[in-house]
């Protein structure tokens, strides 16, 4: 039976940053994700292997990719970066080239180095899917966020999205701010001003008290203590009071506005614990959507038509 998927036509379908995708390609991926959600089937005609290389801790992204791969009938090879030959001095390139030589058909990589993929993209002949690079980019998270917003509102044009929190260290913020702007949304930023480097002057700044009355979508970000080298000047309580989504602030949001968060969530820091699963929260919906989005991305990577 024919499956109603749209087809791409490149020969090597890397997914490194959202800026590498045209708006048409984004539309194709969201379309294919919806087809998978609706029960459509796709699997490769031959046995294909996908290697997951994670050099940073991950729960949602790693498991979501593995579930997506298995649902597509792919053979999954999980490589623990902390136990790989990289710990013996092997370069990331040599590790990737080794897996390509062994017969792996695509690589899913998360790495702590910003833009790690620059040394790989023109030298590795199999598709590379970026599962997060340092403070740089997280394209599959951005795609699942876009799909979640599209499901909710059916549009991006003039939609007001406030991205709030640790923007300086967030690969999610960068991917989403750039792409939502390309799609016609109105993006605002919020949070501690010292964490707005690279954003302030590009996107308008609002306080959280202003954001809750303005936004259609509030996208909260975790305070990434591991990237601050112990320099965070806020206590959890003071951050929550000044910059977090408190119960009182949530009550002032527009009736149809939603709350998003890429997780992991620091309860009672960026968001009150009782709001994590409140009616306007889409946090666990985002996680659910990650599987179909990653199925669509894997299909794109492994399709030669």
Curated annotation (Swiss-Prot):
Keywords: Pyrimidine biosynthesis, Transferase
GO cellular component: cytosol
Keyword GTP-binding: no
E.C. number(s) listed in UniProt: 2.1.3.2
Cysteine pairings via disulfide bonds: none
Binding positions for L-aspartate per the UniProt entry: 88, 171, 222
GO molecular function: amino acid binding; aspartate carbamoyltransferase activity
Reaction(s) catalysed (UniProt annotation): carbamoyl phosphate + L-aspartate = N-carbamoyl-L-aspartate + phosphate + H(+)
Protein origin, superkingdom: Bacteria
Pathway: Pyrimidine metabolism; UMP biosynthesis via de novo pathway; (S)-dihydroorotate from bicarbonate: step 2/3
Family matches, as PROSITE patterns: CARBAMOYLTRANSFERASE
Residues that hold carbamoyl phosphate according to the record: 60-61, 110, 138, 141, 263-264
One of the GO BP terms on file: 'de novo' pyrimidine nucleobase biosynthetic process
Enzyme class: transferase
Keyword Transferase in annotation: yes
InterPro entries in the cross-refs: Asp/Orn_carbamoyltranf_P-bd, Asp/Orn_carbamoylTrfase, Asp/Orn_carbamoylTrfase_sf, Asp_carbamoyltransf, Asp_carbamoyltransf_Asp/Orn-bd
Function text: Catalyzes the condensation of carbamoyl phosphate and aspartate to form carbamoyl aspartate and inorganic phosphate, the committed step in the de novo pyrimidine nucleotide biosynthesis pathway.
Subunit structure as annotated in this protein's UniProt entry: Heterododecamer (2C3:3R2) of six catalytic PyrB chains organized as two trimers (C3), and six regulatory PyrI chains organized as three dimers (R2).
Family label: Belongs to the aspartate/ornithine carbamoyltransferase superfamily. ATCase family.
Protein name (database record): Aspartate carbamoyltransferase catalytic subunit
Species, as recorded: Halalkalibacterium halodurans (strain ATCC BAA-125 / DSM 18197 / FERM 7344 / JCM 9153 / C-125)
């Amino acid at each position: 039976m024919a499956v109603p998927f749209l087809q791409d036509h490149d020969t090597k379908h890397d997914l490194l940053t959202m800026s590498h995708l045209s708006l048409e390609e984004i539309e194709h991926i969201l379309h294919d994700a919806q087809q998978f959600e609706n029960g459509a089937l796709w699997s490769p005609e031959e046995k294909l292997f996908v290697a997951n290389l994670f050099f940073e801790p991950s729960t949602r992204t790693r498991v979501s990719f593995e579930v997506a791969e298995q649902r597509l009938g792919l053979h999954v090879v999980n490589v623990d970066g902390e136990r790989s030959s990289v710990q013996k001095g092997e370069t990331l390139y040599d590790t990737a080239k080794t897996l390509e030589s062994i017969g792996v058909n695509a690589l899913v990589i998360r790495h702590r180095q910003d833009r790690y993929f620059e040394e790989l993209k023109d030298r590795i002949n199999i598709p590379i899917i970026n599962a997060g690079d340092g403070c740089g980019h997280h394209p599959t998270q951005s795609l699942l966020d876009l799909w979640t917003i599209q499901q909710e509102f059916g549009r991006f044009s003039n939609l007001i999205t406030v991205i709030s929190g640790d923007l300086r260290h967030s690969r999610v913020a960068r991917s989403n701010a750039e792409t939502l702007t390309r799609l016609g949304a109105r993006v605002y930023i919020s949070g501690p001003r010292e964490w707005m480097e690279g954003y302030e002057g590009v996107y308008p700044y609002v306080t959280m008290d202003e954001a809750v009355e303005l936004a259609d979508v509030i996208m909260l970000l975790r305070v990434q203590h591991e990237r601050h080298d112990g320099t965070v000047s806020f206590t959890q309580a003071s951050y929550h009071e000044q910059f977090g989504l408190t119960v009182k602030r949530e009550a002032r949001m527009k009736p149809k506005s939603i709350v998003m968060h890429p997780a992991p969530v620091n309860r009672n820091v960026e968001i009150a614990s009782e709001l994590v699963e409140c009616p306007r929260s889409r946090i666990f919906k985002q996680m659910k959507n990650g599987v179909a989005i990653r199925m669509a991305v894997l299909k794109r990577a492994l399709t030669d038509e």
